Amino acid sequence: MPQNAAPPRPDKRKPQAAGTGLKSRLAAYEILKLVASGRYLDEAMRKASGLEPRDRAFARMLVTTCLRRGGQIDAVLGVAMSKPPAGRARDAIHVMRMGVAQLLFMDTGAHAAVDSTVSLMRAAGFERMTCLLYTSDAADD
């Protein structure tokens, strides 16, 4: 590679799990969906059993923060949203809760929290909602 050439850019359509914590966040998302459907937390946590101990601990911390601070998180989201997502997009609320939890209640940097939330929205199949978040944010500027 020539000296002045920039390194290749990652494909933005495919979130990179390595180094970004996406695996632990995906596990947390799946766990939150299971808990919301009535499963016990300990039973749902089996979704994270294949993760490295550090990632498993982060997923558990993220899930428990979302559950413990759920009322506060939903109050913040209620200000930002005119109505909750419906249909298949209803599960996107878990991703948004995780993003707010990281921003307000965990020691996650703002850039990392926002980037991981957008990546997780894409990985979970909510590309259209991700675009809507971008456009509504740009309209507010």
Model-derived regions, located:
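Short, well-structured alpha-helical segments
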Residues: 56, 60-63, 90-93, 97, ...
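N-terminal interaction/assembly modules
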Residues: 1-83, 100
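Inter-helical turn/loop segments and adjacent helix faces that build the functional surface
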Residues: 120-128
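Short, charged amphipathic recognition helices of the HTH superfamily
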Residues: 41-43, 109-118
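Contiguous, well-ordered alpha-helical segments that form the cores/surfaces of helical PPI scaffolds
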Residues: 93-104, 119
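Conserved small/polar residues in nucleotide/adenosyl-binding loops
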Residues: 134-139
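Short, flexible active-site-proximal loops enriched in glycine and acidic residues
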Residues: 86-93, 105-114, 127-132
